[in-house]
Amino acid sequence: IMFKGTDKFGTSNYEAERPYLKQIEKLYEEYRHITDPAKRKVWYHKIDSVSQIAAQYNIPNEYDKLMAAIGSQGTNAYTSNDVTCYVENIPSNEIDSWAKVQGDRFQNMVIRGFHTELEAVYEEYNMGLTSDGRKLFTALMAKLFPNHPYGTQTTIGRGEHLKNPSIVNIKNYFHKYYVPNNIAICLSGDLDPDKTITTIEKYFGSWKPSTHI
C-alpha cells in the first residue's frame, strides 16, 4: 500500500480518482458487515467494478520508477513483530530527491489498488497455512506469549481479518502510528551530516507528531 503513491504521484488525475477511492472505501465498510455469502458476492462485484474505474487513473509502479530515476537499488519493505521497515540504497548525491518522495508518501499516503493488494496478501496467508515451519512458530509463540501480541497476533493477521478488510481501519492505523514520534530514519554512507539533517528537516519538518503514542 505504501508503494502506491500519494495525491501527487501514482495517479494521472487525483481529483478525478478521489471520488472512486472514497466509494471503494465505503463499499468495503459495508461489505465487512455482510454475512450472507450471496450478498457478499454481489457486493464484491460492486467493489471490483468501481476499482476498475479507479484503476484508469492509477500509474502502476511510479514509485519504483521515481526511485530508479535517482539510481536507487534494493527497494524493499518488511514487517516483523516489532518494526515495519522500508529500505532503499541510493546514491549519496540524491538525498534531496529521495527525501522529497519519502516525505510525501509517509505523510500523504493514498490507498489505491486495494483489492489486488488484498488478494496478494491473502495468497501469502494461504501459503503460510501449508507451511509446517510457519505453523510450528505460530503455535510456539502462542504458548510463550498467551497474553501478548507476540502470541495472540501474527504479522499477517487472521483469515477473518483478510475476509473483512477495512480501509478506514488502515487509515486510522496509518495516522496513529506513521508519525514522527514513532519513526526512525536511519541513514549510513558517504553523507554530510549537517546537509543531510537540513534536507530531512526540509521534507519532514512539518510532520506533526501524534499525541496517542
Regions found by a protein language model. Give the residues of each.
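Active-site recognition of the HExxH zinc-binding catalytic motif
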Residues: 1-8
